[in-house]
Amino acid sequence: MCDDEVAALVVDNGSGMCKAGFAGDDAPRAVFPSIVGRPRHQGVMVGMGQKDSYVGDEAQSKRGILTLKYPIEHGIVTNWDDMEKIWHHTFYNELRVPPEEHPVLLTEAPLNPKANREKMTQIMFETFNAPAMYVAIQAVLSLYASGRTTGIVLDSGDGVTHTVPIYEGYALPHAILRLDLAGRDLTDYLSKILTERGYSFTTTAEREIVRDIKEKLCYVALDFEQEMATAASSSSLEKSYELPDGQVITIGNERFRCPESLFQPILLGMESAGIHETTYNSIMKCDVDIRKDLYANTVLSGGTTMFPGIADRMQKEITSLAPSTMKIKIIAPPERKYSVWIGGSILASLSTFQQMWISKQEYDESGPSIVHRKCF
């Protein structure tokens, strides 16, 4: 809290979902899709008080007549006009607070381009007139939320996956690795392998159904080959799912074949290292003296790490890559879907953090580049 007990606003903008709320709370008040929709045909929505754009859940529910855009691709903001709309919606419709009365903590992807941080800073001060703001790296916030300041974070959301080694609260940029394989790709892959079973999901509405199947029924196998054999020889792994129209579908080995692609991207036709190898490669780019601390503090974060079995599998895979005497610990906090936001809530409510905010006055004196001096 600031001197006069005004709660800071914490906004975590993800590729798939935006999480927003008040510093000091233990969970975000608002979680909505990061999408902006515009009517495909002017005048189609007669008498609806024709709006020229819709954001979040409203865009989702009217998607039949809208063209949907995601302003954040692979974790990085690519469309600033739409991003501004999402922030406006966050402050005025979701949180219902005037941003000019609250400090705002925003999150950014690791390796976010410098120009992007400046643009975020500029929009907060010039468009929304925030009294103060700060930009924090997502993975660092997840680590804080787990009660650590040193460790490596595997952060996997809807649009991108990063491995971020952090030492004493600072991300080590030379060792950060990015993998363009995340939740959206897994949903696409699941719809593809369900097609092989004869179930077709093509429209955006049906994509949402596949995402729900993924979230409710998929899991990571400890031993993929063995699990495939079990699935082939018995029906013990089969589960049924009721579609909105009442039809019931059965899903078997798809349950673990879908998230297996995190460990074997070749299943998606991608020639890249899996999340376990990427984590290992990231650790190997760090100074030899801190590797031990990273192996022992490997923290999972983001919605795509929510699959049951993922921590055990990571433990197994990293153990086989690392030196045999190394102590390896994978930390998978139950609230990891929102741990970036939670870390932001913790950070922004610390009394020691209050001097870290970029104030409107500092911005007016130095311009957008102030963000590089104050936020690192």
Swiss-Prot record:
* Subunit composition and interactions: Polymerization of globular actin (G-actin) leads to a structural filament (F-actin) in the form of a two-stranded helix. Each actin can bind to 4 others.
The family annotation for this protein states:
Belongs to the actin family.
Please indicate if the UniProt record lists Nucleotide-binding as a keyword.
yes
The protein here is known as Actin, muscle
Q: Which domain of life is it from?
A: Eukaryota
- This entry's Enzyme Commission designation comes to 3.6.4.-
Q: What does this protein do?
A: Actins are highly conserved proteins that are involved in various types of cell motility and are ubiquitously expressed in all eukaryotic cells.
Propeptide found at 1-2
Gene source species: Aplysia californica
Tissue specificity statement from the Swiss-Prot or TrEMBL entry:
Expressed in the muscular cells of the sheath surrounding abdominal ganglions.
Which reactions does this protein catalyse? ATP + H2O = ADP + phosphate + H(+)
> Where, subcellularly, is it found?
Cytoplasm, Cytoskeleton
In-chain residues carrying the UniProt-annotated modification N-acetylaspartate? D3
**Cross-referenced PANTHER family, in alphabetical order?**
ACTIN
